[in-house]
């Protein structure tokens, strides 16, 4: 199976290495966050959808983006979290309180979002980092509070947002780690690959072992993602907002060339 963006090539307007926008007809993808970890605001005439909520700076970016677009906060109806690590959920409660959005996450990562997970073995390193992140957040006056989870992601489901987002459960990094595949005509096949891999000019790599719950399962999931043969990919950790570039990097990584 090969998924791609068809004949409609995205128009990329770069605002620098850590930000940007893709246009697919009247639909858009806005990158929020920064070079360390990104969230993505999906925009079309039907409403707004946020994929992941980054850390504590993202809620302010969301508010500014919505205002710049001339949209209302109530139009941000869905927040889809690819998995429950703190760098993807840190702003969820604040964004939910501001917009009233429903929050989606896979059932297997509910305890991650609620910060009730017990990290074991080598993955304890992730727990230590998240503890440090919460301490830094409190020092900045931003105590982590979990959002109210309103819906669960399931493998194969088609989310009724942005023309349709197909859920692909890719466990390993976390038990409930998911990717999302766009099915709208203009952007069919654009994959939001979450933390399946990181993509930078200086390094294209799998998530560090101490951030991954099950490395064997994560490798199976990475290969399952590559087997889709996507032509357009946006990871959560990347440099340039160039989906075709990240698709090529993914193929090279799994093929053994990176």
Task: Please report, for each region that a protein language model flagged, where it lies by residue.
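Conserved beta-strand hairpin/beta-sheet module of binuclear metal-dependent hydrolase folds
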Residues: 18-69, 179-196
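Core dinuclear metal-dependent hydrolase active-site scaffold
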Residues: 41-42, 152-185
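Pre-active-site segment of Zn-dependent metallo-hydrolases
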Residues: 49-79, 123, 140-143, 148-149
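Active-site neighborhood of phospho(di)ester-bond hydrolases with catalytic His/Asp-centered motifs
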Residues: 51-54, 77-84, 103-106, 169-172, ...
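Active-site environment of divalent metal-dependent phosphoester hydrolases
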Residues: 56-58, 84-89, 112-113, 175-177, ...
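Active-site metal-binding motif and surrounding structural segment of the metallo-beta-lactamase
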Residues: 59-105, 109, 232
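Divalent-metal (often Zn2+) His-rich catalytic cores of metallo-beta-lactamase-fold enzymes
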Residues: 97, 158, 181-182, 188-190, ...
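Metallo-beta-lactamase
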Residues: 110-168, 213, 217-229
């Amino acid at each position: 199976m090969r998924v791609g963006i068809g004949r409609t090539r995205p128009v990329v307007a770069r605002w620098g290495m850590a930000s940007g926008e893709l246009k697919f007809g009247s639909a858009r993808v806005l990158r929020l966050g920064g070079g360390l970890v990104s969230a993505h605001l999906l925009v079309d005439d039907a409403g707004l959808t946020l994929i992941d909520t980054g850390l504590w700076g993202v809620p302010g970016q969301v508010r500014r983006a919505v205002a710049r677009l001339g949209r209302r906060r109530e139009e941000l109806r869905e927040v889809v979290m690819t998995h429950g690590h703190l760098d993807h959920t840190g702003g969820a409660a604040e964004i939910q309180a501001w917009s009233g959005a429903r929050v989606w996450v896979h059932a297997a990562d509910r305890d991650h979002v609620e910060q009730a997970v017990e990290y074991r073995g080598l993955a304890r390193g992730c727990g230590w980092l998240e503890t440090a992140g919460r301490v830094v957040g409190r020092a900045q006056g931003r105590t982590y509070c979990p959002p109210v989870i309103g819906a669960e992601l399931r493998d194969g489901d088609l989310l009724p947002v942005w023309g349709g987002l197909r859920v692909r459960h890719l466990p390993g990094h976390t038990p409930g780690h998911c990717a999302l595949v766009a099915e709208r005509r203009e952007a069919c096949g654009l994959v939001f690959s979450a933390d399946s891999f990181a993509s930078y000019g200086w390094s294209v790599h799998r998530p560090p072992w101490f951030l991954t719950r099950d490395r064997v399962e994560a490798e199976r999931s990475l290969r399952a993602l590559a087997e889709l043969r996507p032509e357009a990919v946006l990871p959560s950790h990347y440099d340039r907002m160039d989906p075709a570039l990240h698709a090529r990097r993914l193929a090279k990584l799994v093929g053994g060339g990176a």
